[in-house]
């Protein structure tokens, strides 16, 4: 890792520190969720960073001011050096969290991670129904393993943090999802409707809930919030909606290259999880220092500030609130990452969003029609 290379830093747009570092340790995963955010072509990605290379990334990012480090994937548990990486991150002063499906987790590994200094474990579920969960995961044993490991995480003194990715095929069971979380003594529950990137975008026609489904689910969630608050119950419910039913875009990542730094398994550095699909050459930690990447690389400066914005964003009085929306969504839905996010009603491409809403109401795909995330499918997509 070195610092050589041209500087594309923009005067007046000096970034702060990359406070949140995400280490996507691997794209390997025993599950095949059809809403995975990993790139469609994950099967052709390069060799994973070694233990030593990851630790050097952690060190350099910490020097820049990174404070929180997430271990993600794929499934990070397939990395046999995970405890060593956790210990190194802890020694550098990071707050660390493990984002996992729970597949591959054991009580022994939980204890090992605790000894290494891991602060937080989040376990994801596909559904509260065993059959649907296992179908979406592609494993007949997934649901039972998740239940066992959720209980084990709690027993080892960790806060119980659960994530349910919701979509049109499970969101109507939101009440049962919440009940299951309470049975597991969850402290925090993220009820996160699919965000349509990667495999989720490929399967959007089969995953996007209708507006009526979302409104019902949010209403039930709010009723449970009121009930839990009245009982002084510690469980917190977080409801995340897709922006497909909004008229203004989200402030994606709180601005491009502003707070978030993602390092992919092969060392490519990204300003968000999905940016790899853009027609932008992003830097790699094997070739450049993290400091150079964050401050000077073309990829991280491409959409900083607002000088890149065309109309209607350039003259919009909301541009410093939403930063023009999501660059990846603009690229996926309009073919040009510089365009206004089509979620915005001011966008010339807003009809794409309206059409997706109509499709959710009129012609959705069934569970059996989804393209599941696996190595074979990725290789076929790579050849297409």
Swiss-Prot record:
A Pfam family assignment: Radical_SAM
The entry's keywords: 4Fe-4S, Iron, Iron-sulfur, Metal-binding, Oxidoreductase, PQQ biosynthesis, S-adenosyl-L-methionine
GO biological process: pyrroloquinoline quinone biosynthetic process
CDD domains recorded: Radical_SAM, SPASM_PqqE
Domain Radical SAM core: 15-231
Subunit field text: Interacts with PqqD. The interaction is necessary for activity of PqqE.
Record's protein name: PqqA peptide cyclase
